[in-house]
Structure formats: structure tokens, C-alpha cells
Amino acid sequence: MATYVNDLRLKEIATGDESGTWGTSTNTNLELIGEAFSVGTEALSDASTGTITVQDGTSDAARSMNMKLSGSLSQACTVTLAPNTLSKVWCIENNAGDVVTISQGTGANVVIPNGGIRMVVADGAGSGAAITDVLDVLGGTGNIALGSGAMGVALTTGTDNVAIGENALDAVTSGTDNTAVGDNALGADTTGQRHVAVGSGALLLNTTASNNTAVGYNALTTTTTGGDNTAIGDFSLDANTTGGSNVAVGQNSLGANTTASQNTAVGVSALLLNTTGTRNVAVGYTALDANTTVSDNTGVGYNALTANTTGSNNTAVGSQALEANTTALNNTAIGYKSLEVNTTGATNTGLGSYALALNTTASYNSAVGYNALGANTTGAQNTAVGYGALDANTTAANNVAVGFEALSANTTGASNVAVGSAALDANTTGTYNVGVGYEALSASTTTSQNTGVGYRALKANTGSYNSAFGMSALQTNTTGSNNTAVGRDALVSNTTGANNTAVGYLSLYTNSTGASNTAFGAEALEKNTTDSNTAFGYQAAEETTTGDFNVAVGASAFEDNTTGAQNTAIGGYALRNNTTANNNVAVGYLALDVNTTGAQNVAVGAYALDAASTASNNIAVGYRALSQNTTGNENVSIGTDSMLDNTTGAGNVAVGMESLANLTTASSNVGVGKQALNTTTTGASNTAVGFQALRLNATTHYNVAVGTGTLYNNVASNNTAVGFEALNDNTTGASNVAVGAYALDANTTASNNVAFGKSALGANTTGATNTALGGDTLAANTTGGSLVAIGYNALAANTTASYNIAIGENAMVANTTGTDNVAVGYGALDANTTTSYNTAVGKNALGATVAEGNTGVGREALS
């Protein structure tokens, strides 16, 4: 029985009933036929030439259609296929290690690089036989053509072209690097380069253009010279002639385009009707499909810009974005149905699903976020950023909303600004409002001209003309108007209070209905509830609740006041502890600092009256004036450190630096002049007017000192000194009266002296009960007592004598130690020095007397 053993599974008859010589020959031939269609390997020797001969009637690897060349060539080798009359096709694979040239005769050869594969045919023409690469078409090189008329007969120098299909690339002459797959693909191309045409009629009319890619039936079918186009899809760019640099992906995309360039269309019928419009981008089913001649539009998404005809510079990204736009310019819509019904509205921007979805003719709007400005129809120049921002706005213009549902209920309210989630979200018709921050002005509906900046600033507001800057500033305000709050929680509790100004953290925090208050500084007027208070500074008037018409300026000024009214505190900690007292004025750091219930006080200067707690009706002007006063009332202290140490003393007046500085509990003193009554502590009812008047007086009373240095050293009581340094040295002398410059100037311990006139009793130290009236009267007296001198120079030289009486100018002018003399008249007893018991009445009476016991009455008697 016959067997089936060869590679072609042909019947071999050498066995069975057909065996015999003929059967054996037949078997051999059948095996050789099978070998011809199989794979064979020929080993090449390392030489520059070699021959592979197909043997007659015997098995031979050279007979195989797929012949592999092996070996280890170190040089190029020319292999001759023999015999030269053999006409056959081989697929030769070169693995011999170097370049192999396949030859048969003197005709053409085929060069196969190491590792290369070539399909060759030997023409068997004898000595002139040639080897041809069956895939190297006509005159070019590296070309592949499959199909009737593929690459035709015109190709001369074109290289590396591929044509598959009837008449594909059939007109090409010198074109290179083209690929045409499909009937008539690139059928008219002559010199064009780097084209790819896949599909029947693709790039059919292209002649000289280059760098086109067409995939699909009739894709780019009419293009002649337009280059750098890409068309993927049946009829894509099928009307294009000279337009270049276009991209069309999808059936009918850019289907009407003729000469326009630089368009991109991705999607069925995208840019379908475009003819000459350039630089358009359409991505999505029917995107920009009505666009004809306008340029610079971008439509990405189903029906994006689908109705656009002449509008340019538009951008639409998202299904149905700018779907109804026809002639409008410069719009940007990104998101599902963004600017969907817009027709002629220009220069709008919508980013987000339904952003500006109902806008028709309005222009210059910007919407970013889901449904932002979603209901807007004709409102212009609005800006909305955030989910639902301005989503109810219809016709209002010039609004700005940034944040989740910012201005979300606004319909016709114009010129509002809302930045922050739910900012101004209830506003409907209110205008000129500004809300910046989460829920800022969120309850405002129809009110206008409010400004709220900060978390929940003016959150509950329904009033107008309010300004709030800071977290929760004016948060609970309802109908209050004309309020200004700057700082976290400033005026946070205000409901109906109007005309308030609060600047600073917690300023006017508790105020709800109080009006016309002004608070500048953290916690200023924090607990205020009433009207017309003014506070500037940290914690100024912080505790004030119902007190009104107060003014507090300075850190912690008037801090603890509760119900006190009509007070003024200016300076850090001024009137800090005041609680219920009224009508106080404190100006200066710590002025009236500890005052609680004391009223009608005036303190001007740092530390002035700073220890006073319940004292009233005091006036302190100057640094530390009345600084230690606690309960002393009705004092007046003007000057640095004046009445510095006074605690309970009342009814004192101190004018001048350090005047009455050491006074503690005494009352009814008057000190006018620097250091007047400076050391007085408990002495009362003293009056000192002049620089250092009564300076050292401490505990004594009822002294009067008028003039610089008067009673400077005094520590006694009941003295009166008027004049420069009058009674200047007096210490313990009491009940003296000195009027005139240097009067009783040296007096120390003497008492009951009276001196009127310049230097009267000027040298007196311990002499007591003297009376001197007139300039230089008793001027030299030191210890003499019970003397009377009336008249200029009377008893002027008297030193220690006592009991003399001299009345008249120069009376007893020379007397020094004489006693018990009486001289009345000009120059009476004027020569007497040491004698005693004389009486002289009359001008110059006893004028020359120097003896004792004389009596002279009359002009110049006994002279």
C-alpha cells in the first residue's frame, strides 16, 4: 500500500501495488518537490566567492524555497546560484557573519546584509542571468507593492514606499517613505513623501503634498497639495484640497474643510461644516459641526459649540458646553452644559458643570464651579467661583462670588462681593455688599452696602451700612446699621445697636443694643451694653456694662468700669479699676488707676492719683501728682510729684513740681511753687507760695509763706512770711510775721516777731517779741527781744539789746546793746550805741547823747 511521508503529504507509490522502477522515480521526484517548498541550510566557506548548485535528481538544501545561509565569514562573499539556466524564487536569510551578494550571471545582483532576508528571483538567462529582489519595485529601492497596478509603472527613484491594494500609489515617481493600503490609496501621488493612507480612496488625489496621514474610506480623498494633515475615519477631511496641518479623527470630521489649516477635530462630524476656519479644536460627537469660516475655537465634548457659525476665540470643554453659541466671541466653557444656551453673550468664562448654563446674551461673566451662575441669563460682568456660587442670579450685574454657595440665592442684587463658603448666600436683591469669609453676611437678603470680612462676619445681618472685619465680627447683628467692627469677635453680640465702631479682638463683644460706641483695641468695651462710650486701647473700658458717655484711651484704661458714667480716661491703665464712679477725668499712664467709686476727680499725668480708690473731687495735674492719695478729697495738685505722698489729706492745693510732695494725711494746705511745703507730712492749714516756700515744714500748722525761699527751714506753726527769703532760716520760731525781702531772714527759734520791710529783722536769730516796720529796721538784731522799730533804718544796728522803742527814720540807728530806750522822731537818739534808759521825742532829740537816763522832748532836744 502506498505511503504519505513527504512534507507536502504527496502520495508515494514505491510500495504497494504501484511499486516498481517507475514508482521509485516518482517517489524521488515527489520528495524533491516537497524539499523545494521546505527550509534548507547552506554552509558558506570563509572566502570572497562561493557557488551553490542545485543538484539534479538528488536531495539538496539549495533546492529549498526558504534557504538559510550559515557560516563564519570574515569578509564579504559573492555567492553564485547554479546552474545559470535555473529560473526559481528563493527567500534567502543571511546568517553567515558578513555581507553576501547573490549572483547568477553577469546580470543584476542582490546584496543581503548579515542578518537580512530577501525574496529573490533568478531569471535563468544563462551567462547574462540576473538576480532580482521581488519586493524592490521598478527603479526605486526598498519599495513594496502588492496589488494590481500598485505603484504602477511610473516609479523611477522613489524609495521605501509600501503600496498594498489595487492602483495604490500607482502614479508615484520619486515619492519616498509613503505607505498606501487600499484601492486607489494615494492613487495620484507623484512626489509626495511620508504619507500614510489606509482605506479605499484615502489620499486619492494627493499629488505633491507630504506628511499626510489618512485612515478610512475616502479620508483626505480630495487633498492635492495640502500637507501635514491627519485624517482617521471614513470621509474625514474628504473635501480638503490645500489645507495643511489639520487633524481629523472620526467619521465626517472636518468633512467640508477645503483650504483651512491647523484645525483639530476628534469625533464623528466634529467640525463637519468647517471650510476655511483655522486653528479650531473640536473633540466630541458633532463638536463645532456648524462652524464654517471662523477661527480659534476649541470645542471638546458631545455637541460642544455645535451651533457655532461665526463666533471665534471660543473654548468649550464638556458635553453640550456652549452648545447654542452662534456668533459670540471670546467665551470659555469647561464642564457639562457649561454656557449651554449662550448665543451671543461674549467674553464669558464658565468652568464646571452647568456653569453659566442658562446664560444667553450677557457678557463678561466668569463662573467656576458646579452650577456657578447657573441661572444667569442677561446679568453681565459677574464672577462666581465655587459650587453653586451665584447659581440663582438672573439679571444682576457686577457681582463677585468665590466659595461654596457664595451669593447662591442672589437674583437681581448687583455689585456684591462674596468670598467664602456660604458668604452672602441668602442675599437676593441687596446691593453693594462685601462678604469675605465662611458664612460672612450669610443671612443678609435685601440690605445694602454692608462689608463683612472674616469667618461668620455679619453672619445674621439684615441691617445696612455695616462693616465687619475679623472672625465672627458683628456675627449676630440683625437690624443694626452703620456699625464698624474690625477684629475677631468684635461686636459679635450686636443685634440692633447702631452707629458703633469696634476695632480689636473682642472689642464691644457683649454689646447688643448699645449705640454710638467707639472701641479701638483688643477687648476694648468688651462688656458694654449701653450708648455713647469711647474706648481706645487694649482692654480699655473692658468691664463697662451700663455706664455711658465714657471715654477711655490707652491699654486697660477704664478696664474694670461697670456702671460708671461720664468718665474720661486717657493713658495706659488710666481709671483701670473704676467701677461705678462718675464724672472722672484721668489722663496719663496709671492715672486714677485704682479708683473704684471716687467721683468728680481730674488726674492728668502718669501715675496721677493712681492710688485713689474712693476719694472724690480731686484735681491732679502732673507726673505722679497725688500719686499716693487714697481717700483724700477735694485736693488740687498741679506739677510733677506734687502732693506725691498724700493719702487721706483733704482740701489741699499744690501747684508746682514737688510741692507738698511728702504730705500724707494733713488737710487745708496750699503750696504754690516748686518744692513749696515739700516736706510737709501732717502739718495742716499752711499756705506757701513761691519756690521752696516752707520747703522743710513737716508737721506744723497755720503758716503762710509767700515768696522764694520764705520759711524754707520752718518746722514751727503760725508764722507768716511774705517776700524773698523772708523767715528763710526759721526752724522752730512760731507766730512770726515777716513781710519783705529778707525780712526775719536769719530767724531760727525766736517767736512772736513782726517784720515789715526789706531786711527788717533780717539778722534776727533768737530775739523774740520784736516789731520792725520799715526797710532795714532792726536789720542787725540777733538776740534782742521786745523791741519796736518803726521807720527806715530804725534800730538798724541793734544786735542784742532789748526793750527799745524807735519810731522814725534813723531813730536809734546806731544803737547796738543799749536797752530800755525810747526814740520817737527822725534821727532821735541816732548816736546812741550802748547806753540805756533814755527817752527822746522829736527830730534829732538826744541826737548826740551817749549817756544814760536822759529825757529829751522837742526838736533837737538835748542834742
Pin down the residues of each PLM region:
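Exposed extracellular interaction/assembly regions and N-terminal maturation sites
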Residues: 1-9, 14-100
